[in-house]
A protein has these predicted regions:
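N-terminal short beta-loop-beta anion/metal-coordinating cradle
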Residues: 1-66
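Active-site-proximal beta-strand elements of phosphoester/diester hydrolases
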Residues: 43-48, 141-143, 189
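Short, well-ordered amphipathic alpha-helical segments that serve as non-catalytic structural scaffolds
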Residues: 58, 62, 123-127, 212-220
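His/Asp/Glu-rich mid-to-C-terminal helical/loop segments that flank catalytic regions of hydrolases
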Residues: 196-220
Length: 220
């Protein structure tokens, strides 16, 4: 199976790249790709950049250049539910934009003409939830938007609109939309690096990268 993996940041990309065997490097246009093997699967890893537009462009180019059988978006996310702790993982049962409003006749979070929620592929979700590690894996809603969520007011607004939301990030929604349009099976697999609204929020985030990241990305 050929699996595309998209990360936003170099810190995320480098953690996943460490897990690949027999690596080869490619450049196509503005994007660089690392091809390698994990458990007899061919992995195509790319870094798209932060935010929805970068993520969408990266997903399109990955599909166009390599025709993967499925795509995984991975990286860090903020936990917005009390059930989550730093280093827990959220696998997307569904994904929504938390910063989209197309006016009357559309649900909040819905781009007109598209589903409000983009569903994680059921086979990929089942695979994710069947992993046996010491890391808690939760399946649920990931909320995406073009803002790094830092304070309680922002968190409460997102939870008010999407009470079932577990995590927030800046890329999963747009990659899910591209995969929906191109009919490529997709799932987002996000490691919780921080909990927005916590008094020590920034300390959580920096501690994750300083002490925990190299123990987290192997779950992906």
């Amino acid at each position: 199976m050929k699996i595309g993996i998209i990360t936003a940041m170099s810190s995320e990309h480098d953690q996943v790249a460490l897990l690949l065997e027999n690596k080869k490097e490619y450049t196509e246009g503005i994007y660089s790709y690392t091809e390698g093997q994990i458990h007899n699967n061919t992995i195509i890893l790319t870094q798209c950049g932060i935010g929805k537009v970068n993520a969408a462009a990266g997903a399109v180019e990955l599909i166009r250049n390599f025709q993967p059988d499925c795509i995984i978006s991975t990286g860090v996310a903020g936990g917005i539910d009390k059930c989550l702790k730093v280093m827990d993982v959220v696998a997307s049962s569904h994904i929504v934009y938390h910063d989209v409003w197309c006016g009357e006749g559309n649900a909040y979070g819905q781009i007109q003409g598209l589903p409000t929620y983009f569903e994680g592929h059921p086979i990929l979700l089942n695979c994710a939830m069947s992993i046996h590690t010491g890391t808690p894996i939760h399946n649920g809603l990931i909320c995406s938007g073009d803002k790094f969520i830092t304070d309680r007011k922002e968190l409460n607004e997102i939870k008010g609109n999407f009470p079932e939301g577990l995590a927030v990030d800046m890329e999963s929604g747009s990659i899910a939309q591209i995969c929906y349009l191109y009919k490529v099976p997709f799932i987002s697999f996000r490691i919780i690096s921080d909990t927005p609204g916590a008094e020590n929020h920034w300390e959580q985030y920096t501690n994750f990268w300083g002490e925990m990241a190299n123990r987290s990305f192997g779950v992906t």
